[in-house]
Amino acid sequence: MSLYGLFTLATSYLPSVGGGAALAAKAQLGKARSLYVPDLFAGILSGEPTRNPHEEEVGRASEEWTKKLVKMDKRTAKILTKANFAYLVSLAAPLADEEAFRMGVDWCIWAFVFDDQFDEGPMRDKGIEAAREIIDMLATQDDTCALVDPVVHPLQYMFQSVWQRFKARNPSPGLERRWKYTHKRCLFAILKQVDATQRKITLDVDLDDYMETRRHSIGAYSLFAVVEWAHAIKAPEEAMNHPSVQTCERVAADLTWLVNDVLSYKKDLAFGVEHNLTRLLMRQGLTEQGAMDKLGQLMESNQRDWEDAIAELPHWEDEETNKEVRRYLDACAAVGRANLHWSFKSGRYLNAEQGRKVRETRIMDLP
Protein backbone atom coordinates (compact mmCIF):
# COMPACT_ATOMS: atom_id res chain seq x y z
CA MET A 1 0.00 0.00 0.00
CA SER A 2 1.46 3.36 -1.01
CA LEU A 3 1.76 6.39 1.25
CA TYR A 4 -1.28 7.88 -0.50
CA GLY A 5 -3.44 4.83 0.15
CA LEU A 6 -1.89 3.77 3.43
CA PHE A 7 -3.81 5.70 6.05
CA THR A 8 -7.39 6.46 7.03
CA LEU A 9 -8.18 8.09 10.38
CA ALA A 10 -5.75 7.77 13.27
CA THR A 11 -6.56 4.81 15.50
CA SER A 12 -6.75 4.53 19.26
CA TYR A 13 -7.08 1.05 20.67
CA LEU A 14 -8.22 -0.98 23.65
CA PRO A 15 -7.08 -4.31 25.11
CA SER A 16 -8.31 -7.38 23.23
CA VAL A 17 -11.19 -9.32 24.71
CA GLY A 18 -11.47 -13.08 24.45
CA GLY A 19 -13.60 -15.82 25.95
CA GLY A 20 -17.36 -15.37 26.17
CA ALA A 21 -17.43 -11.86 24.75
CA ALA A 22 -15.68 -12.96 21.58
CA LEU A 23 -17.89 -16.04 21.22
CA ALA A 24 -21.03 -13.95 21.67
CA ALA A 25 -19.80 -11.52 19.05
CA LYS A 26 -19.11 -14.33 16.62
CA ALA A 27 -22.70 -15.52 16.99
CA GLN A 28 -23.95 -12.14 15.70
CA LEU A 29 -21.98 -12.21 12.46
CA GLY A 30 -25.06 -13.02 10.43
CA LYS A 31 -26.55 -9.57 11.05
CA ALA A 32 -24.10 -7.86 8.70
CA ARG A 33 -21.45 -8.80 6.18
CA SER A 34 -18.57 -9.27 8.54
CA LEU A 35 -15.64 -11.55 9.17
CA TYR A 36 -14.42 -13.08 12.40
CA VAL A 37 -10.68 -12.50 12.41
CA PRO A 38 -7.88 -14.41 14.17
CA ASP A 39 -6.63 -13.56 17.64
CA LEU A 40 -3.78 -11.27 16.63
CA PHE A 41 -2.51 -10.48 20.13
CA ALA A 42 -1.45 -14.03 20.97
CA GLY A 43 1.81 -15.85 21.60
CA ILE A 44 4.89 -13.82 20.73
CA LEU A 45 2.68 -10.92 19.64
CA SER A 46 1.09 -10.61 23.09
CA GLY A 47 2.02 -8.11 25.77
CA GLU A 48 2.61 -4.37 25.77
CA PRO A 49 5.79 -3.32 23.93
CA THR A 50 8.41 -0.96 25.35
CA ARG A 51 9.03 2.39 23.63
CA ASN A 52 12.31 4.09 22.86
CA PRO A 53 12.80 7.37 24.77
CA HIS A 54 14.18 9.10 21.65
CA GLU A 55 11.02 8.46 19.62
CA GLU A 56 9.48 11.93 19.48
CA GLU A 57 12.56 14.09 18.93
CA VAL A 58 14.31 11.77 16.49
CA GLY A 59 11.10 11.04 14.62
CA ARG A 60 10.58 14.74 13.96
CA ALA A 61 14.14 15.23 12.74
CA SER A 62 14.02 12.21 10.45
CA GLU A 63 10.73 13.31 8.90
CA GLU A 64 12.00 16.82 8.20
CA TRP A 65 15.18 15.46 6.63
CA THR A 66 13.18 13.15 4.36
CA LYS A 67 10.67 15.81 3.35
CA LYS A 68 13.43 18.20 2.25
CA LEU A 69 15.53 15.51 0.62
CA VAL A 70 12.80 14.08 -1.62
CA LYS A 71 11.02 17.44 -1.99
CA MET A 72 7.68 16.16 -0.72
CA ASP A 73 4.56 18.11 -1.52
CA LYS A 74 2.40 19.18 1.43
CA ARG A 75 -0.06 16.34 1.02
CA THR A 76 2.58 13.62 1.04
CA ALA A 77 4.46 15.32 3.89
CA LYS A 78 1.29 15.32 5.99
CA ILE A 79 0.79 11.62 5.30
CA LEU A 80 4.39 10.88 6.28
CA THR A 81 3.88 12.63 9.62
CA LYS A 82 0.65 10.74 10.19
CA ALA A 83 2.40 7.45 9.47
CA ASN A 84 4.67 7.97 12.50
CA PHE A 85 7.33 5.47 11.48
CA ALA A 86 9.32 6.50 14.56
CA TYR A 87 6.66 4.74 16.66
CA LEU A 88 7.16 1.52 14.70
CA VAL A 89 10.94 1.62 15.15
CA SER A 90 10.53 2.70 18.78
CA LEU A 91 8.70 -0.55 19.57
CA ALA A 92 11.09 -2.65 17.48
CA ALA A 93 14.29 -1.14 18.91
CA PRO A 94 13.43 0.27 22.35
CA LEU A 95 17.04 0.02 23.62
CA ALA A 96 18.75 1.76 20.70
CA ASP A 97 20.79 4.85 21.55
CA GLU A 98 19.84 8.14 19.89
CA GLU A 99 22.24 7.80 16.96
CA ALA A 100 21.27 4.20 16.23
CA PHE A 101 17.60 5.01 16.62
CA ARG A 102 17.90 7.84 14.09
CA MET A 103 19.46 5.43 11.61
CA GLY A 104 16.61 2.98 12.21
CA VAL A 105 13.93 5.60 11.60
CA ASP A 106 15.68 6.88 8.47
CA TRP A 107 15.89 3.29 7.23
CA CYS A 108 12.22 2.65 7.93
CA ILE A 109 11.06 5.77 6.11
CA TRP A 110 13.34 4.92 3.18
CA ALA A 111 11.90 1.39 3.03
CA PHE A 112 8.29 2.56 2.83
CA VAL A 113 8.90 5.43 0.42
CA PHE A 114 11.04 3.21 -1.82
CA ASP A 115 8.43 0.46 -1.81
CA ASP A 116 5.77 2.98 -2.90
CA GLN A 117 7.17 2.93 -6.41
CA PHE A 118 6.48 -0.78 -6.79
CA ASP A 119 3.24 -1.02 -4.82
CA GLU A 120 0.87 1.57 -6.27
CA GLY A 121 3.49 3.80 -7.88
CA PRO A 122 4.84 4.22 -11.41
CA MET A 123 6.86 0.98 -11.42
CA ARG A 124 4.20 -1.37 -10.06
CA ASP A 125 3.97 -3.18 -13.42
CA LYS A 126 7.22 -2.18 -15.14
CA GLY A 127 9.65 -5.04 -14.65
CA ILE A 128 12.66 -3.65 -16.52
CA GLU A 129 12.52 -0.23 -14.87
CA ALA A 130 11.96 -1.83 -11.47
CA ALA A 131 14.92 -4.17 -11.92
CA ARG A 132 17.18 -1.27 -12.87
CA GLU A 133 16.09 0.75 -9.83
CA ILE A 134 16.63 -2.19 -7.48
CA ILE A 135 20.07 -3.02 -8.88
CA ASP A 136 21.15 0.61 -8.57
CA MET A 137 19.87 0.73 -4.98
CA LEU A 138 21.73 -2.40 -3.92
CA ALA A 139 24.90 -1.13 -5.61
CA THR A 140 25.12 1.75 -3.12
CA GLN A 141 26.28 -0.82 -0.54
CA ASP A 142 29.41 -1.52 -2.57
CA ASP A 143 32.42 0.24 -1.09
CA THR A 144 33.54 1.14 -4.62
CA CYS A 145 30.26 2.97 -5.33
CA ALA A 146 30.65 6.72 -5.73
CA LEU A 147 28.76 9.04 -3.41
CA VAL A 148 25.22 9.42 -4.68
CA ASP A 149 24.01 12.88 -5.68
CA PRO A 150 21.08 13.63 -3.32
CA VAL A 151 19.47 15.94 -5.87
CA VAL A 152 19.48 13.37 -8.67
CA HIS A 153 18.80 10.20 -6.65
CA PRO A 154 17.42 11.14 -3.21
CA LEU A 155 16.26 7.64 -2.25
CA GLN A 156 19.58 6.08 -3.23
CA TYR A 157 21.27 8.81 -1.20
CA MET A 158 19.09 7.94 1.81
CA PHE A 159 19.97 4.26 1.60
CA GLN A 160 23.66 4.96 1.09
CA SER A 161 23.61 7.26 4.11
CA VAL A 162 22.01 4.53 6.21
CA TRP A 163 24.58 2.02 4.95
CA GLN A 164 27.48 4.32 5.80
CA ARG A 165 26.17 4.79 9.35
CA PHE A 166 25.73 1.03 9.65
CA LYS A 167 29.34 0.49 8.57
CA ALA A 168 30.66 3.22 10.87
CA ARG A 169 30.04 1.04 13.92
CA ASN A 170 32.18 -1.77 12.53
CA PRO A 171 29.55 -4.52 12.34
CA SER A 172 30.77 -8.10 12.42
CA PRO A 173 31.28 -9.83 9.06
CA GLY A 174 28.24 -11.98 9.85
CA LEU A 175 25.98 -9.00 10.52
CA GLU A 176 27.22 -7.22 7.39
CA ARG A 177 26.48 -10.36 5.40
CA ARG A 178 22.97 -10.59 6.92
CA TRP A 179 22.33 -6.92 6.16
CA LYS A 180 23.23 -7.30 2.50
CA TYR A 181 21.53 -10.65 2.05
CA THR A 182 18.23 -9.65 3.67
CA HIS A 183 18.01 -6.46 1.63
CA LYS A 184 18.76 -8.35 -1.57
CA ARG A 185 16.09 -10.95 -0.78
CA CYS A 186 13.59 -8.22 0.09
CA LEU A 187 14.14 -6.19 -3.05
CA PHE A 188 14.21 -9.25 -5.30
CA ALA A 189 10.91 -10.39 -3.75
CA ILE A 190 9.44 -6.97 -4.54
CA LEU A 191 10.67 -7.38 -8.12
CA LYS A 192 8.96 -10.76 -8.27
CA GLN A 193 5.69 -9.11 -7.24
CA VAL A 194 6.15 -6.46 -9.93
CA ASP A 195 6.60 -9.24 -12.48
CA ALA A 196 3.42 -10.95 -11.28
CA THR A 197 1.49 -7.68 -11.56
CA GLN A 198 2.87 -6.99 -15.03
CA ARG A 199 1.89 -10.47 -16.21
CA LYS A 200 -1.44 -10.32 -14.33
CA ILE A 201 -0.77 -13.54 -12.42
CA THR A 202 -0.84 -12.15 -8.86
CA LEU A 203 -3.29 -14.84 -7.69
CA ASP A 204 -2.22 -17.56 -10.13
CA VAL A 205 0.62 -18.78 -7.94
CA ASP A 206 1.39 -21.72 -5.70
CA LEU A 207 0.55 -21.05 -2.03
CA ASP A 208 4.01 -21.95 -0.75
CA ASP A 209 5.65 -19.77 -3.40
CA TYR A 210 3.35 -16.87 -2.51
CA MET A 211 4.19 -17.20 1.18
CA GLU A 212 7.92 -17.38 0.49
CA THR A 213 7.75 -14.18 -1.53
CA ARG A 214 5.68 -12.36 1.08
CA ARG A 215 7.92 -13.27 4.01
CA HIS A 216 10.82 -11.56 2.26
CA SER A 217 9.06 -8.65 0.54
CA ILE A 218 7.57 -7.50 3.86
CA GLY A 219 11.04 -6.35 4.97
CA ALA A 220 10.99 -8.01 8.40
CA TYR A 221 14.29 -9.83 7.88
CA SER A 222 15.98 -6.54 7.04
CA LEU A 223 14.52 -4.95 10.16
CA PHE A 224 15.89 -7.87 12.21
CA ALA A 225 19.35 -6.85 10.99
CA VAL A 226 18.66 -3.18 11.79
CA VAL A 227 17.67 -4.04 15.37
CA GLU A 228 20.57 -6.49 15.77
CA TRP A 229 22.88 -3.60 14.88
CA ALA A 230 21.03 -0.95 16.89
CA HIS A 231 20.97 -3.11 20.04
CA ALA A 232 24.60 -4.21 19.54
CA ILE A 233 23.65 -7.89 19.71
CA LYS A 234 26.77 -10.06 19.48
CA ALA A 235 25.62 -13.64 18.95
CA PRO A 236 28.28 -15.79 17.21
CA GLU A 237 27.70 -17.12 13.70
CA GLU A 238 27.35 -20.69 14.95
CA ALA A 239 24.34 -19.63 16.98
CA MET A 240 22.84 -17.34 14.34
CA ASN A 241 22.96 -20.17 11.80
CA HIS A 242 21.26 -22.69 14.09
CA PRO A 243 17.98 -24.06 12.61
CA SER A 244 16.00 -22.99 15.70
CA VAL A 245 17.11 -19.37 15.30
CA GLN A 246 16.28 -19.43 11.60
CA THR A 247 12.85 -20.90 12.36
CA CYS A 248 12.15 -18.09 14.81
CA GLU A 249 13.16 -15.54 12.17
CA ARG A 250 10.79 -17.12 9.67
CA VAL A 251 7.94 -17.21 12.19
CA ALA A 252 8.33 -13.53 13.12
CA ALA A 253 8.43 -12.55 9.44
CA ASP A 254 5.38 -14.68 8.60
CA LEU A 255 3.36 -13.31 11.51
CA THR A 256 4.18 -9.80 10.31
CA TRP A 257 2.74 -10.22 6.83
CA LEU A 258 -0.15 -12.41 8.02
CA VAL A 259 -1.20 -9.67 10.45
CA ASN A 260 -1.04 -7.20 7.56
CA ASP A 261 -3.22 -9.40 5.35
CA VAL A 262 -5.83 -9.76 8.11
CA LEU A 263 -6.00 -6.07 8.98
CA SER A 264 -5.75 -4.80 5.39
CA TYR A 265 -8.51 -7.00 3.99
CA LYS A 266 -11.30 -4.44 4.43
CA LYS A 267 -9.25 -1.72 2.78
CA ASP A 268 -8.02 -4.06 0.05
CA LEU A 269 -11.64 -4.80 -0.86
CA ALA A 270 -12.46 -1.11 -1.01
CA PHE A 271 -9.48 -0.35 -3.28
CA GLY A 272 -9.76 -3.48 -5.41
CA VAL A 273 -6.38 -4.80 -4.26
CA GLU A 274 -6.00 -8.55 -4.79
CA HIS A 275 -2.52 -8.96 -3.33
CA ASN A 276 -3.82 -10.57 -0.13
CA LEU A 277 -3.67 -14.19 1.01
CA THR A 278 -7.41 -14.15 1.72
CA ARG A 279 -8.09 -13.43 -1.94
CA LEU A 280 -5.67 -16.15 -3.06
CA LEU A 281 -7.33 -18.74 -0.83
CA MET A 282 -10.78 -17.72 -2.10
CA ARG A 283 -9.45 -18.12 -5.64
CA GLN A 284 -8.53 -21.67 -4.64
CA GLY A 285 -12.05 -22.48 -3.47
CA LEU A 286 -12.41 -21.36 0.15
CA THR A 287 -15.23 -19.14 1.33
CA GLU A 288 -14.37 -15.67 2.56
CA GLN A 289 -14.69 -16.70 6.22
CA GLY A 290 -12.94 -19.99 5.49
CA ALA A 291 -10.02 -18.10 3.98
CA MET A 292 -9.77 -15.81 7.00
CA ASP A 293 -9.93 -18.85 9.29
CA LYS A 294 -7.06 -20.34 7.29
CA LEU A 295 -4.97 -17.26 8.02
CA GLY A 296 -5.69 -17.84 11.70
CA GLN A 297 -4.62 -21.46 11.40
CA LEU A 298 -1.38 -20.38 9.74
CA MET A 299 -0.73 -17.93 12.58
CA GLU A 300 -1.37 -20.63 15.18
CA SER A 301 0.93 -23.02 13.32
CA ASN A 302 3.65 -20.39 13.30
CA GLN A 303 3.26 -19.83 17.04
CA ARG A 304 3.71 -23.59 17.60
CA ASP A 305 6.78 -23.57 15.35
CA TRP A 306 8.27 -20.83 17.53
CA GLU A 307 7.62 -22.81 20.71
CA ASP A 308 9.13 -25.96 19.20
CA ALA A 309 12.18 -24.05 17.99
CA ILE A 310 12.76 -22.56 21.44
CA ALA A 311 12.45 -26.03 22.99
CA GLU A 312 15.06 -27.38 20.57
CA LEU A 313 17.47 -24.47 21.00
CA PRO A 314 20.76 -25.78 22.42
CA HIS A 315 22.38 -24.48 25.57
CA TRP A 316 25.82 -23.20 24.67
CA GLU A 317 28.68 -23.56 27.13
CA ASP A 318 29.34 -19.83 26.89
CA GLU A 319 26.60 -18.09 28.88
CA GLU A 320 27.20 -14.89 26.93
CA THR A 321 26.19 -16.72 23.75
CA ASN A 322 22.94 -17.88 25.36
CA LYS A 323 22.24 -14.32 26.49
CA GLU A 324 22.89 -12.79 23.07
CA VAL A 325 20.80 -15.42 21.26
CA ARG A 326 17.92 -14.68 23.63
CA ARG A 327 18.30 -10.97 22.93
CA TYR A 328 18.18 -11.60 19.19
CA LEU A 329 15.08 -13.78 19.41
CA ASP A 330 13.43 -11.14 21.59
CA ALA A 331 14.27 -8.60 18.87
CA CYS A 332 12.63 -10.76 16.19
CA ALA A 333 9.47 -11.06 18.29
CA ALA A 334 9.55 -7.31 18.99
CA VAL A 335 9.53 -6.57 15.26
CA GLY A 336 6.33 -8.58 14.79
CA ARG A 337 4.73 -7.02 17.86
CA ALA A 338 5.79 -3.53 16.76
CA ASN A 339 4.14 -3.97 13.37
CA LEU A 340 0.90 -5.13 15.01
CA HIS A 341 0.64 -2.23 17.47
CA TRP A 342 1.75 0.33 14.88
CA SER A 343 -0.85 -0.94 12.40
CA PHE A 344 -3.61 -0.15 14.89
CA LYS A 345 -2.19 3.11 16.25
CA SER A 346 -1.35 4.62 12.86
CA GLY A 347 -4.73 3.84 11.32
CA ARG A 348 -3.00 2.45 8.25
CA TYR A 349 -5.86 0.00 7.64
CA LEU A 350 -8.68 0.76 10.10
CA ASN A 351 -9.93 4.01 11.58
CA ALA A 352 -10.36 4.46 15.33
CA GLU A 353 -13.87 3.00 15.58
CA GLN A 354 -13.08 0.07 13.29
CA GLY A 355 -9.86 -0.66 15.15
CA ARG A 356 -11.59 -0.70 18.52
CA LYS A 357 -14.22 -3.11 17.27
CA VAL A 358 -11.66 -5.51 15.83
CA ARG A 359 -9.63 -5.48 19.05
CA GLU A 360 -12.65 -5.88 21.32
CA THR A 361 -14.70 -8.41 19.35
CA ARG A 362 -12.46 -9.71 16.55
CA ILE A 363 -15.24 -8.77 14.12
CA MET A 364 -14.37 -6.82 10.98
CA ASP A 365 -17.27 -5.21 9.13
CA LEU A 366 -16.77 -5.26 5.37
CA PRO A 367 -17.75 -2.72 2.69
From Swiss-Prot:
Biological process (GO), any one: antibiotic biosynthetic process
Pfam family name, one: Terpene_syn_C_2
Keywords from the named record: Antibiotic biosynthesis, Glycoprotein, Lyase, Magnesium, Metal-binding, Signal
Cleaved signal peptide residues: 1-24
Recorded superkingdom: Eukaryota
MF terms in GO: metal ion binding; terpene synthase activity
Glycan-carrying positions: 276
InterPro entries noted in UniProt: Isoprenoid_synthase_dom_sf, Terpene_cyclase-like_2
Record EC number: 4.2.3.191
Sites where the protein binds Mg(2+) 1: 115
Function summary: Cycloaraneosene synthase; part of the gene cluster that mediates the biosynthesis of sordarin and hypoxysordarin, glycoside antibiotics with a unique tetracyclic diterpene aglycone structure. First, the geranylgeranyl diphosphate synthase sdnC constructs GGDP from farnesyl diphosphate and isopentenyl diphosphate. The diterpene cyclase sdnA then catalyzes the cyclization of GGDP to afford cycloaraneosene.
Protein name: Cycloaraneosene synthase sdnA
Lineage of origin: Eukaryota, Fungi, Dikarya, Ascomycota, Pezizomycotina
